[in-house]
């Protein structure tokens, strides 16, 4: 898949296996979001969307509904230069940042901006562990997650709060993977 040999037909087949009736709309959404992306790039984005991102969103919604504790949502959008930039921000990519250990060549390639981001993210996790709130001077004010605005901290070269990121994909994936019954 990394070598770019995935065809549009194979992309469709693999997305259909997880998206069902939402396949056409999701493929269009990913094509629009990644116009220069190869089929392999769009497949990785789609599988990330279905296997990790939207399920995290659905879980956050359940916790918000319980009203027992504040919920905070984040997205790591920083793109690693490792492996010619093909690694992207993948599952568990946040761990080197949380532990302020970004010198690993296979994940962050020791990039200078990775070190800066690690200082911000590790300060954020420390603040959360100490106070129950991630707010600290290293990042913008981080509001709690709520269904009304879906405030999400985006960790990247420039950290920022985005409301309901990837709205269209969230709605499509929510319908495709939501539990029934």
Regions found by a protein language model. Name each.
Residues 158-181:
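Tryptophan-rich aromatic "cage" segments
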Residues 114-139:
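Non-catalytic, well-ordered alpha-helical segments in soluble enzyme domains
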Residues 75, 79, 131-158:
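Polar, surface-exposed loop/tail segments
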Residues 66-67, 89, 119, 145-147:
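Extracellular/periplasmic catalytic domains that process cell-envelope and extracellular macromolecules
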């Amino acid at each position: 898949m990394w070598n770019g040999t995935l065809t549009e037909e194979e992309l469709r087949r693999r997305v259909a296996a997880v998206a069902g009736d939402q396949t056409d709309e999701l493929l269009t959404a990913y094509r629009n979001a990644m116009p220069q992306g190869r089929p392999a790039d769009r497949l990785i984005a789609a599988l990330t969307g279905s296997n990790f991102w939207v399920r995290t969103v659905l879980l956050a919604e359940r916790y918000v509904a319980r009203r027992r504790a504040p919920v905070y949502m984040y997205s790591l959008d920083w793109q690693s230069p490792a492996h010619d930039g093909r690694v992207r921000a993948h599952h568990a990519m946040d761990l080197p940042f949380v532990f302020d250990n970004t010198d690993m060549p296979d994940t962050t390639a020791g990039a200078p901006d990775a070190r800066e981001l690690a200082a911000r993210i590790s300060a954020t996790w420390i603040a959360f562990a100490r106070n129950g709130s991630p707010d600290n001077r290293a990042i913008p004010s981080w509001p709690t997650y709520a269904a009304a605005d879906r405030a999400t901290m985006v960790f990247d070269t420039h950290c920022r709060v985005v409301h309901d990121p990837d709205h269209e994909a969230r709605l499509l994936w929510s319908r495709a993977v939501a539990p029934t019954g």
